[in-house]
Amino acid sequence: MALIPYALARPFLFSLDPETAHELTVRALALTQGTALQLAYGTSRVNDPITLAGLTFPNRVGLAAGLDKNARCIDGLGAMGFGFVEVGTVTPLAQPGNPRPRLFRLPQAQALINRFGFNNEGLASFMANVKNSTFYRQRQNPNLARKPLPLLLGLNIGKNAATPIERATEDYLTCLDGVYPYADYVAVNISSPNTRNLRSLQSDEALDSLLGAIAHRRQALVAQHGKQTPIFVKIAPDLDASQVDVIAASLRRHGMDGVIATNTTLSRDAVKGLAHADETGGLSGAPVLAMSNRVIGQLRAALGPGFPIIGVGGVMSADDAVSKIRAGADLVQIYTGLIYHGPKLVKQAAALIKTSC
């Protein structure tokens, strides 16, 4: 599939059910991992290094979580020119997610609506896939060829749907224990709209309790593994300024290393009247750009300079990526833009950020 220009592949993919197209893409990327072709793609990655949270990112454009839920195609995705790739969300136990259909295209708006519900194969399978990747094996074997600035890997964690919200912290800590030694950074997903009550973890007391427990567990993990893995928290766009301030204060108070802004939105204002606009789930793509940038700007004002922000939501062009940096983000992630415009968007965005920001 890597041999086919995306402009030719897209009509075929868009003729399929959206989730079938998603699964086909993931399988194709998994099959091409480690090939000379994929490694060749990786050598053309835009070189624009930046150091944040103690990590040196090869460039400022990454893949958002959600495309590779089970860490099956880390190498294939990394070869698209990303500076970093985030996989997951993973939960302690395997779960099927919500019933199909659960992914919908809104092409007139360059948008998607999903209600996947953290469908994944569980932590044990997820970590086996991470360890089986060329990415991981190269890090373990200094005799294998390594790029001057290797791809960075974020592992995104969540809670099982069956876990009561009052016990959510247990799931996050279980996942943190499992992913910690292998991640360049850990992303704590408390903002998916597709797991019941998950977003309540963004409220003042619940967030303090969760982040306090995560910070405490990390102290033990640092002692156990001899490394301090940065922890980022992923938040929603459906927040007002006072809620953003509460979250920013909690991030600082508990020593979190960064924030990912934002997840999908529940708002349908920008897509009213379009087919599938009334489907339940999170809306991503072009309609989220302004909402996400607003939250990024509010976070930057609340957190001040120097606190790492990963901007995600609505990046459909290189100019959109630059707008996130100018709103206050340090790094940018892409997902829905990749579906609509293909891998060329990665390098276009990274190149324009390099020359404009």
From Swiss-Prot:
MF terms (GO), sorted A to Z: dihydroorotate dehydrogenase (quinone) activity
PROSITE patterns from the UniProt entry: DHODEHASE_1, DHODEHASE_2
UniProt keyword annotation of Oxidoreductase present: yes
GO cellular component terms, semicolon-separated: cytoplasm; plasma membrane
Active site: 192 (nucleophile)
Cofactor or coenzyme needed: FMN
Enzyme Commission no: 1.3.5.2
Comment on bound cofactor: Binds 1 FMN per subunit.
Principal place of residence: membrane
Key words of the record: Cell membrane, Flavoprotein, FMN, Membrane, Oxidoreductase, Pyrimidine biosynthesis
Localization, UniProt: Cell membrane
Binding of substrate, residues: 69, 114-118, 189, 194, 263-264
GO terms of biological process kind: 'de novo' pyrimidine nucleobase biosynthetic process; 'de novo' UMP biosynthetic process
Associated pathway: Pyrimidine metabolism; UMP biosynthesis via de novo pathway; orotate from (S)-dihydroorotate (quinone route): step 1/1
Top-rank taxon, per record: Bacteria
Entries under InterPro entries matching the protein: Aldolase_TIM, DHO_dehydrogenase, Dihydroorotate_DH_2, Dihydroorotate_DH_cat, Dihydroorotate_DH_CS
Assembly information from the UniProt record: Monomer.
General function of this protein: Catalyzes the conversion of dihydroorotate to orotate with quinone as electron acceptor.
Name listed for the protein in its UniProt record: Dihydroorotate dehydrogenase (quinone)
Upper classification of the organism: Bacteria, Pseudomonadati, Pseudomonadota, Betaproteobacteria, Burkholderiales
